Regions:
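N-proximal low-complexity "stem/linker" segments adjacent to membrane-targeting elements
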Residues: 1-30
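Glycine-rich, basic loop-to-helix element that forms the pyrophosphate-binding segment
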Residues: 62-81
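Conserved donor NDP-sugar-binding/catalytic core segment of glycosyltransferases
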Residues: 97, 101-132
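A short, conserved alpha-helix in the catalytic core of glycosyltransferases
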Residues: 153-161, 165-170, 175-203
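Non-catalytic, C-terminal membrane-associated alpha-helical segments of glycosyltransferases
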Residues: 220, 236-297
Length: 297
């Protein structure tokens, strides 16, 4: 995008299970209402048919559910290799809604103004209350969601990414299926010198939900946490990172079935292939630390 004389081209990827047709339509209408050049949208049916969508919206129906990263990667490639037919890709949850009409224009400006900006994480707010849940602020100091800052990860269903990032470091890790795939991409992007910003003025309305806490969730969270460390961390930090997360998990006093699923996932993370190992440089570890989140937590 840097040095572009014309306005950066923007696309959007939405994955759906086909079970929220009204919310999906409202989201697509909010994208169509954005100021500036129109945004090209691809809706990926992740193992399900895509409900009716407005004219001009492209749809891809996958025969099986590839998981969240797998579905998003299909959406990226629909915009050419690494998504590079466009300059910027938005990733939006199918039950979200862009609250304002200037969000895409703000994205264009942000990426044009800063060559090293790779990813922007939007603020998720409840449409009724306007409140943002702490877990939706992608940093350890989450008490003030109205404060924008540089961060070390981002929200998968409320972000914008420069497609040069995918071209350089690859897409999301398909095999994760669900949980921590954003942090895997974020760490690879940061290691390549890109920056990630959390912007409180770019808002995705999304109803407040409790995160699903079933056995499969606990298993994937633990397995992917191990994979994340094995794939991306310098060897001395792997046991530190996983030890800290084990203590934090135990401190939350999970139920016995949850703990059983978590430890099952932890074992699975060690006993199964995690994909290519590319440990980040120590200077990236230091950068993450300066940004407020050393990769031990």
């Amino acid at each position: 995008v840097s040095g572009m004389t014309t306005s950066p081209k923007v696309g959007a990827v939405v994955i759906t299970m086909g079970n929220r047709p009204d919310e999906l339509r409202a989201l697509l209408d909010s994208v169509a209402a954005q100021d500036g050049d129109p945004v090209e949208v691809v809706v990926v049916g992740n193992g399900s048919p895509v409900p009716d969508v407005p004219e001009g919206v492209r749809t891809i129906e996958l025969p099986e559910n590839l998981g969240i990263p797998g579905g998003r990667n299909v959406g990226i490639e629909a915009f050419g290799p690494g998504g590079t037919d466009v300059d910027i890709l938005l990733f939006l949850d199918d039950d979200g809604l862009l609250a304002r009409t200037d969000t895409v224009e703000l994205c264009r400006r942000a990426f044009t103004a800063d060559d090293k900006l790779g990813i922007i994480s939007f603020r998720i707010a409840d449409p009724e209350t306007g409140l943002t849940q702490r877990r939706h602020v992608p940093r350890l100091r989450a008490s003030d969601p109205m404060r924008s800052s540089r961060v070390t990860t981002f929200l998968g269903g409320a972000n914008a990414a420069r497609t040069k990032v995918f071209a350089e470091v690859g897409g999301l890790p398909d095999e994760f299926f669900y949980a921590h795939e954003e942090t895997d991409l974020a760490w690879r992007a940061l290691d390549a010198g890109w920056m990630i910003d959390y912007r409180s003025d770019m808002v995705l309305h999304h109803p407040t939900t409790a995160p699903s806490r079933h056995a499969v969730y606990h298993r994937m969270v633990a397995r992917n946490r191990v994979w994340l460390a094995r794939r991306n961390l310098p060897a001395p930090l792997v046991p530190v990172y996983l030890g800290v997360w084990m203590l934090l998990t135990l401190a939350r006093r999970p139920s016995r079935p949850a703990l059983k699923a978590w430890f099952g996932g932890f074992r699975e993370g060690w006993g199964t292939p995690c994909g290519p190992r590319r440990p980040m440089r120590w200077r990236t570890v230091w950068r993450l630390t300066r940004l407020g989140r050393p990769p031990v937590i």
